[in-house]
Amino acid sequence: MNTKIIDGTYIAERIKKDITQKVYADMNMGKRAPGLAMLLIGNNPISKIYIAHKKKVCKQVGFKSFLYNLPITATKTELLQLINILNNDKNIDGILIQLPLPDKLNDIKILEHIIPDKDVDGFHPYNVGRLCQRSPMLRPCTSRGIMTLLKWYNINTFVLNAVIIGASNIVGRPMLMELLLAGCTVSITHRFTQNLQVYVKNADLLIVAVGKANFLPSSWIKPGAIVIDVGINRLKNGNIVGDVHFPSAYKRAAYITPVPGGVGPMTVISLIQNTLQAYHAHVCCDSKKKIHFKKF
């Protein structure tokens, strides 16, 4: 089978160049640079790597990034107070909280405290609700990135039988809504699903997001399927692998994303796209183009 590797790194770079041109065109017209605030609580080394990468991309596209690194001892009240300040800062277009939060702060109300028009992660109930109502505004980044990959490779999703493995709020559930909008018949599986193999073997489009290295046996994959691997797992030898065993899955799939270099870069560039979208809503003089959000 002539399998095609879906190159998320290449596509993200192409989108990055387009965003950079738009940002500098706006700035040449006298507008300010887009601003992204990033909140990091504690010193989780993996989280610090992710934040550093996001800051790097912001600089590359002409955004201003603002890092707020709170100590692990920070209280919920302190975090909410900071979010309030950023909500009202006219130079900030997007606010993201680097997950996971410490257990004592792992409260959905913290994410909900970000006003919807600055929720560039797309996690606020308002933005999730807009997606459910077929009128998306700021969309969850990973699912948006996956849809961009499919579109870039001219993959027609209409009437495909899609299966999502993993029902998280970050990936699985928003992915379900995106695929419904794209005309798929969608099944979403989770830890209580019985006979997972039956679902997988019937999938034309397979999205795997469970966070377990080489979780999915390649023998389950339908020949000619489209395989999107969201997992990022570090093995004991230091290698990074996905939830799907790539070498064997490659022999069965028509399209497949590698790990790394597939979905990961698209998640970051989708965050940048959301921030640019929010920025244009905040600075655009044409009120017809503004995003109008309900105040929470």
Swiss-Prot record:
Record's keyword annotation contains Amino-acid biosynthesis: yes
InterPro entries, A to Z: Aminoacid_DH-like_N_sf, NAD(P)-bd_dom_sf, THF_DH/CycHdrlase, THF_DH/CycHdrlase_cat_dom, THF_DH/CycHdrlase_CS, THF_DH/CycHdrlase_NAD-bd_dom
Binding site residues for NADP(+): G166, A167, S168, I232
GO molecular function ontology, one term from the record: methenyltetrahydrofolate cyclohydrolase activity
Keyword presence, Ligase: no
UniProt KW keywords: Amino-acid biosynthesis, Histidine biosynthesis, Hydrolase, Methionine biosynthesis, Multifunctional enzyme, NADP, One-carbon metabolism, Oxidoreductase, Purine biosynthesis
Transmembrane segments: none
Record function comment: Catalyzes the oxidation of 5,10-methylenetetrahydrofolate to 5,10-methenyltetrahydrofolate and then the hydrolysis of 5,10-methenyltetrahydrofolate to 10-formyltetrahydrofolate.
Quaternary assembly: Homodimer.
Homology family: Belongs to the tetrahydrofolate dehydrogenase/cyclohydrolase family.
Name of this chain's protein: Bifunctional protein FolD
Species whose genome carries this gene: Blochmanniella floridana
Lineage of the organism: Bacteria, Pseudomonadati, Pseudomonadota, Gammaproteobacteria, Enterobacterales
Gene, per the UniProt record: folD
